[in-house]
């Protein structure tokens, strides 16, 4: 089957790559290859001795990566949460000079109706980043308990009508199992008593189900923890998030790792004991938001936040 060419405009492209502080001979990871915007820019800044390891769990992204014929570049089909395993297999633990993550769903995934990510286009109710693994959104919604669906909508979509929508989903699936995105969008819209004139009523539900089906927040947390073991001293983390749930995790991680161990005031400890606790693992270098010009050219960039941190010598 021919793969349609869906356009993808990389958000905060230069800023995210600048955040890595590229060394020509460095070793870098692009944990979310997508359509290769960040990877291609990183490669353009690497010298002959540099290396780039890219990761993506979307088979379409892996197919796109085959167009890069460069001995410094390699692509792995898998989740970025397993980056420590990929690095360990290549005996590069503690030698990585930078990790870039561009979180969430990409424009090609949203724009391709066959992937089932968008309520704006009718397609199979799938939503998997990797359609070859795990349950689709339709399969999960057909088997999940009403209370579990409500919890997911509330937790990952911050949906105030979560219980009402969950009940409507379960009732509809009892009558006729939903298999299409349009069906889910219609059920959610009908179950939503108060409409936001600036937002489709299914927006939060689709976000929540997608995050749950792909274990997105757990993936982020695991990747962040793994980064501490794989980064070299001075290595950079450059992470773009697109909604508050993602950014909250990244912000909390960078803040906690920048503070070092917290010792209660007045607790008697020797200098040797304090040393054993270790110091700060990261140094937070701040955050960036897209400028007005970028948002005008690419409205999806509006909610993006780039956070950068550097591995310390601790």
Swiss-Prot record:
It is an enzyme of class 2 (transferase). Keywords: Cytoplasm, Methyltransferase, rRNA processing, S-adenosyl-L-methionine, Transferase. S-adenosyl-L-methionine binds at residues 36-38, 56, 80, 102, 109. InterPro entries: RsmH, SAM-dep_MeTrfase_MraW_recog, SAM-dependent_MTases_sf. It comes from the Bacteria. GO terms for cellular component: cytoplasm. Gene3D superfamilies: Putative methyltransferase TM0872, insert domain, Vaccinia Virus protein VP39. Its EC number is 2.1.1.199. It is found in: Cytoplasm. It catalyses: cytidine(1402) in 16S rRNA + S-adenosyl-L-methionine = N(4)-methylcytidine(1402) in 16S rRNA + S-adenosyl-L-homocysteine + H(+). One of its GO terms (molecular function) is rRNA (cytosine-N4-)-methyltransferase activity. GO terms for biological process: rRNA base methylation. Belongs to the methyltransferase superfamily. RsmH family. NCBIfam families: 16S rRNA (cytosine(1402)-N(4))-methyltransferase RsmH. Specifically methylates the N4 position of cytidine in position 1402 (C1402) of 16S rRNA. This is Ribosomal RNA small subunit methyltransferase H. The lineage of its organism: Bacteria, Pseudomonadati, Pseudomonadota, Gammaproteobacteria, Enterobacterales.
